[in-house]
């Protein structure tokens, strides 16, 4: 069945181009368009689309307000379009806070110069988020954990929320259908799905994520205490203009410190370094971060596999890695290297993922030592490292 899409934008040119691009995919049908947030709500209620593309700056009602209303009245996956500026990044993070699932930069130049690339990216996003878990899509949604305060009331490190209570997740042995069809030669023992993770003297915590990641990272990191004993590196698929604003937001919300990584930064306990968009991040055995130019041959900039691989080489069995919600399989090969070095790999469970792609790749490859619900990961990190 085709994915039904509602296109919302006050620019007639952009509405037409997005409609043309989406209509060229046989699996997608544009069921309607709207020119402002108010029309978007009316059309969403009338047409019941599978996905909504949403601009931010519109007359009568902006995109963020519209997203909030839509999430309350007819929860629907929303893909936001955002400008490539620091302010655009801030607004996009607010939209994700309101319940949007994902975003794309609104780049008119790319539409003109690279129409095939834009078509592939946009259609891939639409098809993917149409299958997203709406219950897990936003930190502003009804299902959001208490650890995610609203942006208008940013908490200080001293008043960050307490960890969410543990929640049991059915084990793979109890649900055989969820297990991979055929174990491979590198298959570990059945992963843990509840209980306390084994303590180990970890020198680094590495977390990789994509779609749904801004929500998931906030949910996890706000549960960590200021005296968290290990350095952290974060890899979130995100454009260059967005990672600085995202790091700043996390830093305001968390007890630990968070910053966008720069070349030469030194890893230290209680500091999380976020890989800069458009580049690659590696770590060396001296505890120093290396930031490299993004390679155009790679789909992801930053790439989880690259950071995980460097961590495996530099820290051997002393890395605790976590793969959170996201499209595709980035992180799988890096996790394989970590496992070969003796390190630990965790995956987010399907029920709490917005997109069960990256964690599924870890689980299917039999690389996961543990599979945890999003609300439990922060607590387990504390138990494993403190």
From Swiss-Prot:
UniProt keyword terms in alphabetical order: Chemotaxis, Cytoplasm, Hydrolase, Phosphoprotein
Enzyme class: hydrolase
Pfam families on file: CheB_methylest, Response_reg
Catalytic residues (positions): 210, 237, 330
InterPro entries tied to this protein: CheB-like (IPR008248), CheB_C (IPR035909), CheY-like_superfamily (IPR011006), Sig_transdc_resp-reg_Me-estase (IPR000673), Sig_transdc_resp-reg_receiver (IPR001789)
GO cellular component: cytoplasm
EC number from the UniProt entry: 3.1.1.61, 3.5.1.44
GO BP term, pick one: chemotaxis
Signal peptide (from-to): none
All residue ranges annotated as the Response regulatory domain in the record: 4-121
Biased composition (Low complexity): 132-194
Molecular function, one GO term: protein-glutamine glutaminase activity
Residue ranges of domain CheB-type methylesterase in the record: 191-383
Location, primary (coarse class): cytoplasm
Residues modified as 4-aspartylphosphate: 55
Catalytic activity: [protein]-L-glutamate 5-O-methyl ester + H2O = L-glutamyl-[protein] + methanol + H(+); L-glutaminyl-[protein] + H2O = L-glutamyl-[protein] + NH4(+)
Stretches for region Disordered: 132-197
Entry remark concerning the domains of this protein: Contains a C-terminal catalytic domain, and an N-terminal region which modulates catalytic activity.
Function, as annotated: Involved in chemotaxis. Part of a chemotaxis signal transduction system that modulates chemotaxis in response to various stimuli. Catalyzes the demethylation of specific methylglutamate residues introduced into the chemoreceptors (methyl-accepting chemotaxis proteins or MCP) by CheR. Also mediates the irreversible deamidation of specific glutamine residues to glutamic acid.
HAMAP family associated with the record: CheB_chemtxs
PANTHER family, alphabetized: PROTEIN-GLUTAMATE METHYLESTERASE/PROTEIN-GLUTAMINE GLUTAMINASE, PROTEIN-GLUTAMATE METHYLESTERASE_PROTEIN-GLUTAMINE GLUTAMINASE 1
Protein name: Protein-glutamate methylesterase/protein-glutamine glutaminase 3
């Amino acid at each position: 069945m085709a994915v039904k899409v509602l296109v919302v934008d006050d620019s007639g040119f952009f509405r037409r181009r997005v409609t043309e691009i989406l209509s060229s995919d046989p699996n997608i049908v544009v069921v309607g368009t709207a020119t402002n947030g108010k029309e978007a709500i009316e059309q969403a209620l009338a047409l019941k689309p599978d996905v909504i593309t949403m601009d931010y700056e519109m007359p009568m009602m902006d995109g963020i307000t519209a997203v909030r209303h839509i999430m309350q009245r007819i929860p629907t996956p929303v893909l936001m379009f955002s400008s490539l500026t620091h302010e655009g990044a801030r607004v996009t993070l607010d939209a994700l806070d309101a319940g949007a699932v994902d975003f794309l930069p609104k780049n008119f130049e790319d539409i003109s110069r690279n129409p095939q690339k834009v078509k592939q990216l946009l259609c891939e996003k639409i098809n993917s988020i149409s299958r997203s878990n709406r219950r897990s899509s936003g930190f502003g949604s009804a299902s959001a954990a208490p650890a995610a305060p609203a942006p208008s009331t940013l908490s200080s490190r001293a008043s960050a929320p307490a960890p969410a209570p543990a929640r049991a997740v059915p084990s793979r042995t109890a649900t055989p259908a969820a297990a991979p069809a055929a174990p491979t030669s590198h298959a570990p023992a059945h992963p843990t799905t509840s209980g306390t993770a084994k303590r180990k003297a970890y020198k680094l915590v590495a977390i990789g994520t994509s779609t749904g990641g801004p929500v998931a990272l906030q949910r996890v990191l706000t549960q960590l205490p200021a005296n968290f004993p290990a350095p952290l590196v974060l890899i979130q698929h995100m454009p260059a203009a967005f990672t600085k604003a995202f790091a700043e937001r996390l830093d305001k919300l968390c007890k630990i410190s968070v910053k966008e990584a720069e070349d030469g930064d030194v890893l230290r306990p209680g500091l999380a370094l976020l890989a800069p968009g458009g580049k690659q991040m590696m770590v060396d055995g001296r505890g120093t971060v290396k930031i490299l130019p993004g390679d155009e041959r790679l789909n992801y900039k930053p790439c989880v596999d690259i950071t995980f691989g460097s961590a495996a080489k530099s820290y051997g069995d002393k890395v605790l890695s976590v793969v959170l919600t996201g499209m595709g399989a980035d992180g799988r090969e890096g996790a394989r290297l970590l496992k070969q070095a003796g390190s630990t790999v965790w995956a987010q469970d399907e029920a709490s993922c917005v997109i069960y792609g990256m964690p599924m790749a870890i689980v299917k490859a039999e690389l996961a030592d543990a599979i945890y619900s999003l609300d439990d990961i922060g607590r387990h990190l504390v138990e494993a490292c403190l």
